[in-house]
Amino acid sequence: MPEIYVAGTPVAGSPVAGTPVGAQTIAAQPGSNLLDVLLEHGHKVPWSCRSGQCQSCLVQARPDEVPSAAQAQLNAEQQSKGWLLACQCQLQQDMHISLHNPATDDLPARISDMRYLADDILLLRVTPERPLRFRAGQHMVLWLDATLARPYSIASLPGEGDLEFHLRLHPHGAFSNAIRERKTGDTLYMGAAAGHFHYDPGWQETPLLLLGSGTGLAPLQAIARDALQAGHEAPIVLWHWSRSQAQCYLADALSELADQHSQLSLHLRTHAELASDLTQLRLASRKTLALLCGQPAFVEQLRKPLFMAGLPGRQILDEAFISRP
C-alpha cells in the first residue's frame, strides 16, 4: 500500500511564506488518485478541470517518484523540479509531497484596476512584479492566499502591459467573496501561463469559428484580437451566448473591433437562442478551425452540431472548466 508523506499545508488565509503545518503520512490504496487522497485528508489543493488542462492542482515530489503521466502536460523545467498534476497522478509507490506555496513558488502581482463589466462579472487587472511570457487566450492560476486559488483565462494580449481577467462572481463563492474585499494596490500571486488555447501564426489563412458562453468570451476575444493584430487573412466568426442581450459584457468593444476589421463577424445571442442557433451553423470552409470555451456541458452541446456541419474532431479546440465559486 503506497504511503504519501505530505510535508505540510500552508496556513489558510496566510499569503506569506512560512513553515507549513500539519505534516501528515497517508496510507493510500494502489491506483487511487493523488488529488482525491489529498482532498479527502483535508489538504486544500485547488482544482478545476480534473483533466490536467487548467494546471491548478500542482504539487511537488521527488523527481524519481513522479509517474510520467502526471507530468505530461508540464514544461521541461517543471518536470525537472518534480512538479506534477495531482489530478493525473495514480498512486503506485510511496511519494514525498510538498504542497504548492504561492508566496515562494509563484509571481507576485499588484491589483491595478477592479470594476464591474456586468452585475456578476468583474474585470481584474494586475501588474506582475516582472514581465512574464504568455499567449493570448492561455490561462493561469490566481492565488489570493496560501489555500485559495482559481484558474482564469487571460483576456489581454502580450505587450498590453497589465494582465486582464474577467471573473464570474458567485453569490456565496469563497473566491468570489474574497476578491470582492480586495482593492487596488493589494497583492495576489500568479502561476505560470498554461494551455493550448491560443492563436497560432500558422492559422493566417484558416477560417476561425469562435464559440463561447459567459466569461468564455474572455479568451475568445483575446484570440480574435491577437489574430487580427497578426494580420489574419481568413474570416473570423465569433458567436457568444449570454443570459440576456444586455449580458454580452463586451458588446460595444466587439462591435467597434468588427467595424475596424471586415473579416470579423459577430453573433451576440442569448442562451434561449442556443439550440436554434446550433442548427444553423455553417462553415466558411472545410478547413475551418473551431475554438470553444465555456462550461463542460456547453462545450459538449456544440460538438455534434459542428460534426454535422462537416467539422472533424481534430479541427475543434476547447477550453472547458468546471466553475468553482
Task: Locate each region found by the language model.
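Short, contiguous acidic and Ser/Thr-rich linear segments
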Residues: 22-32
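Short conserved beta-strand and strand-loop elements enriched in small hydrophobics
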Residues: 4-6, 97-100, 140-145, 186-192
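Ferredoxin-reductase
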Residues: 105-187, 242-244
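Iron-sulfur (Fe-S) cluster-binding segments and ferredoxin-like electron-carrier domains
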Residues: 34-46, 56-103
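FNR/FR-type flavoprotein reductase catalytic core
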Residues: 161, 166-325
